[in-house]
């Protein structure tokens, strides 16, 4: 990973930012315990309900390892790092968002910034709804990434990171990108309009679906860049 970052850093165009990333401790633990992806991660839920102390120890260890991994990415050329908590909704649903998601990520951020000052950090706690408010208010972020279910105007009015830096990333529905066409164009312009006047990084509300035509991605990028001219 680090060697790849160094190579890309040397060869990429100057106008392109190099973003490093890692899974958040809760999402990593969910996959480790479950053994694979599952909608409800039932084995993970059963484990943390039965062995919460052990689960917290696991999250703490994963926070240490993730912080080191991100620090190494920055030292290898990453200009921005993003922490993905794709399954944060499970913690939120069980009233454990603060203990299972916020506190471990807070530890990561503090570790990273202690060793690499002024690090630019984006966090993505997917599908936590109104809990975005509490999540952002307790973390010193440079940017908060929004899933496609978040109302953008509501986000601008209500989601305020602890350090008051206001930047939003997102939140085109991956299904709309996969379909492409006029509906995609309409949604792109709507997103750009909704984020007018605030710092915004255009992105999807989650990952690119495997059935997405690469031409749709090219069209998306061209549309955004044409809008910026």
Protein language model regions, located:
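Active-site loop segments of alpha/beta catalytic cores
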Residues: 2-229
């Amino acid at each position: 990973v680090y060697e790849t970052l160094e190579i890309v850093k040397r060869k990429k165009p100057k106008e392109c930012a190099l973003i490093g990333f890692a899974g958040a401790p809760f999402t990593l633990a969910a996959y480790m315990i479950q053994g694979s992806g599952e909608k409800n991660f039932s084995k993970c839920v059963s484990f943390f309900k039965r062995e919460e102390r052990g689960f917290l120890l696991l999250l703490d260890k994963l926070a240490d390892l993730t912080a080191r991994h991100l620090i190494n990415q920055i030292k290898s050329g990453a200009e921005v790092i993003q922490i993905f908590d794709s399954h944060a909704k499970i913690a939120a649903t069980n009233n454990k968002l603060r203990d299972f998601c916020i506190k471990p990520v807070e530890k990561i951020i503090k570790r990273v910034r202690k060793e690499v000052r002024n690090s630019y950090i984006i966090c993505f706690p997917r599908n936590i709804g109104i809990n975005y408010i509490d999540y952002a208010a307790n973390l010193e972020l440079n940017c908060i990434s929004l899933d496609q279910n978040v109302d953008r105007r509501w986000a601008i009015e209500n989601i305020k990171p602890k350090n008051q830096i206001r930047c939003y990333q997102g939140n085109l529905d991956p299904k709309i990108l996969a379909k492409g066409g006029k509906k995609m164009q309409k949604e792109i312009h709507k997103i750009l309009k909704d984020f007018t006047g605030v710092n915004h990084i255009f992105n999807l509300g989650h990952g690119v679906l495997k059935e997405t035509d690469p031409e749709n991605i090219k069209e998306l990028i061209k549309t955004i860049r044409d809008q910026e001219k």
